[in-house]
Amino acid sequence: MMIGALHITRGVQTLIDDNKIQYEEIWELVHRHASMDYGDVEDDSVELNNSNINHNYGTILSSYQLHNIKIWICTTLTEEVQDIYTIVMLPEEY
C-alpha cells in the first residue's frame, strides 16, 4: 500500500522528544501499516481497510501498542497519488 507523505503529530513527536518511544519504532509500525498489518483493529475494520485499498479511496486505520501507548496510523487514499498522506498520531489527536 502506498502511504504518500508521512506526518507525525505533536503528541507523537513529544513522546519521541521525551525518549518514551524511538523514531525507529515508529518506522517499524509504518512498515507494518504499509504491509497491511493493521495491528489491533476489529475484523470489520480490517474488511473496511481492505475494501478501501481495493477501491484506492478512503481511510486506512491501524492501531498498535508501543510501550503501553496506543499509536494510530491513518492513511488517506485518493485518486490522485500526490494527494495520499499518512499520519502517525495518538487516538486523542484524531
Predicted feature residues:
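Compact soluble domain cores
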Residues: 1-61
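Short, compact, well-ordered microdomains
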Residues: 56-94
